[in-house]
């Protein structure tokens, strides 16, 4: 997935991290000069330095100028200079005629200035790919900008047709390349989510636009400094829209006396969490608190479930409020254990494959189906885009349901169903194929590297 992120232009977060690393790391040449000077002042004979087999061109040129020769061959000089580094080649580099187009800039000004919809990059992608019918998919919170974006793209890409996909989009798992292809589209632009489904897996050409949102970081820093004593260790996480801000404020918080950790659950980006996937923070990290940057609680609850003993706080960049958040861990775990216990005595199971975008993984479904067949348990298959209690209640002969769609549907709403509604993990626990979490932590790693959301055919066979 990290390769996919590079192909879709990772953006400012990586640039900020690299710049901070460069500032924090002193040059080796400066370190050597400082050490030599200190030894000379103390009257000590400087130690013979090992030969530098390969050095950068700039360092080699400086050494040659000092020695009055074109190639340094002394005891501590360079014996070879590095070849000139080729100019960096940027993928999806947008031409100046697009970036500096005054008419395009005027059109983009109709959109919120702090929302980066990457319009120039999208136009360039449409032009270079030769796309004629472009699907635009975004969460409901951004749909009010959809027609404006559509108008801009059709104006600056003559001859194309845009199609706004209006079905609900809960997250990155809902990317709907299947429907876009069925509607004759040859490019899908998916907004506000990371590339959970790789671009080499989608059935049509796909462009992910993260929609970086700029916020007032000064107020965030002031709020933290006012409420927490310096020296605290903070784990900072958020949704992909605020990922650049997370990396941007890290150095400022560290200057304020805080120790900052930006955790990662691979293959997601550092600091990024999903409603079903978040990093597990260890005791060695010595985290004092979790800070979530974003609105709403859905994503925050994921890391709270996965780290029940660490206090969690939410900074809402829209209301500019910092709040302490809590979660009913005991109640949730009790409800899920009850559902698992009931499922063990079920005589007929129903397997639901989620059809909302890419939510349903057929290989995960196949893994559970294999275990049920091995035990001789009758199965009914159901394909649903959205799962409601009333619909499942119509099939009263099914005594247990397993939904391969969104784990949070069972965790948040499982109590509303008349029959147990299990996640894939819970189903495997009920069948004795996975261990119960016991007195420990309920896992939230569905789209992690080894999560059940990433089940492959090989895992079913084994």
UniProtKB/Swiss-Prot annotation:
The record's Gene Ontology cellular component field reads: 2-(3-amino-3-carboxypropyl)histidine synthase complex; cytoplasm
Where is this gene product found? Answer: Cytoplasm
Describe the reaction catalysed, as an equation: L-histidyl-[translation elongation factor 2] + S-adenosyl-L-methionine = 2-[(3S)-amino-3-carboxypropyl]-L-histidyl-[translation elongation factor 2] + S-methyl-5'-thioadenosine + H(+)
Q: How is the cofactor bound?
A: Binds 1 [4Fe-4S] cluster per subunit. The cluster is coordinated with 3 cysteines and an exchangeable S-adenosyl-L-methionine.
The ranges of region (Disordered) come to: 1-87
* InterPro entries per UniProt: DPH1/DPH2, DPH1/DPH2_1, DPH1/DPH2_2, DPH1/DPH2_3
Per its UniProt record, what NCBIfam families does this chain match? diphth2_R
Binding partners and assembly: Component of the 2-(3-amino-3-carboxypropyl)histidine synthase complex composed of DPH1, DPH2, DPH3 and a NADH-dependent reductase, predominantly CBR1.
* Function field: Catalyzes the first step of diphthamide biosynthesis, a post-translational modification of histidine which occurs in elongation factor 2. DPH1 and DPH2 transfer a 3-amino-3-carboxypropyl (ACP) group from S-adenosyl-L-methionine (SAM) to a histidine residue, the reaction is assisted by a reduction system comprising DPH3 and a NADH-dependent reductase, predominantly CBR1.
State what protein this is by name.
2-(3-amino-3-carboxypropyl)histidine synthase subunit 1
Q: Which organism is it from?
A: Gibberella zeae (strain ATCC MYA-4620 / CBS 123657 / FGSC 9075 / NRRL 31084 / PH-1)
Q: Which gene is this protein's source?
A: DPH1
């Amino acid at each position: 997935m990290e390769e996919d992120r590079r192909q879709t232009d990772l953006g400012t977060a990586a640039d900020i991290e690299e710049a901070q690393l460069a500032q924090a790391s002193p040059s080796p040449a400066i370190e050597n000069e400082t050490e030599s000077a200190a030894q000379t002042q103390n009257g000590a004979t400087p130690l013979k330095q090992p030969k530098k087999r390969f050095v950068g061109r700039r360092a080699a040129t400086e050494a040659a100028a000092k020695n009055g020769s074109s190639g340094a061959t002394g005891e501590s000089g360079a014996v070879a200079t590095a070849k000139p580094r080729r100019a960096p080649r940027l993928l999806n580099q947008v031409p100046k005629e697009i970036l500096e187009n005054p008419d395009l800039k005027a059109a983009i000004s109709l959109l919120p200035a702090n929302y980066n919809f990457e319009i120039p990059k999208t136009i360039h992608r449409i032009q270079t790919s030769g796309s004629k019918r472009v699907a635009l998919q975004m969460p409901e919170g951004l749909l009010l900008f959809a027609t404006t974006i559509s108008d801009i793209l059709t104006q600056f890409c003559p001859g194309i047709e845009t199609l706004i996909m209006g079905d609900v989009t809960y997250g990155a798992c809902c990317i709907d390349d299947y429907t876009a292809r069925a509607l004759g589209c040859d490019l899908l632009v998916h907004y506000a989510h990371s590339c959970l489904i790789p671009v080499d897996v989608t059935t049509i050409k796909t462009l992910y636009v993260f929609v970086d949102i700029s916020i007032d970081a000064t107020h965030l820093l002031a709020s933290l400094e006012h409420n927490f004593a310096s020296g605290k260790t903070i784990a900072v996480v958020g949704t992909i829209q605020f990922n650049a801000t997370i990396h941007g404020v890290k150095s400022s918080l560290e200057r304020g006396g805080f120790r900052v950790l930006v955790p990662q659950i691979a293959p997601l980006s550092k600091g990024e969490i999903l409603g079903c996937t978040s990093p597990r923070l260890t005791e060695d990290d010595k985290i004092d608190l979790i800070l979530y940057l974003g609105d709403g609680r859905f994503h925050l609850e994921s890391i709270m479930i996965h780290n029940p003993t660490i206090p969690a706080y939410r900074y809402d960049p829209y209301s500019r409020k910092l709040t302490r958040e809590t979660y009913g861990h005991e109640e949730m775990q009790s409800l899920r254990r009850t559902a698992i216990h009931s499922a063990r005595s079920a005589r007929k199971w129903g397997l639901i494959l989620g059809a909302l975008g890419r939510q349903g993984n057929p290989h995960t479904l196949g893994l559970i189906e294999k275990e049920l067949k091995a035990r001789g348990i009758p199965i009914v298959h159901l394909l649903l885009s959205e799962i409601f209690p009333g619909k499942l209640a119509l099939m009263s002969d099914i005594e247990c349901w397993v939904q391969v769609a969104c784990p949070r549907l069972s965790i948040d709403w499982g109590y509303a169903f008349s029959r147990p509604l299990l996640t894939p993990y819970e189903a495997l626990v009920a069948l004795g194929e996975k261990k119960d979490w016991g007195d420990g932590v309920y896992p939230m790693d569905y789209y992690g590297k080894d999560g059940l959301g990433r089940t492959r055919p090989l895992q079913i066979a084994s």
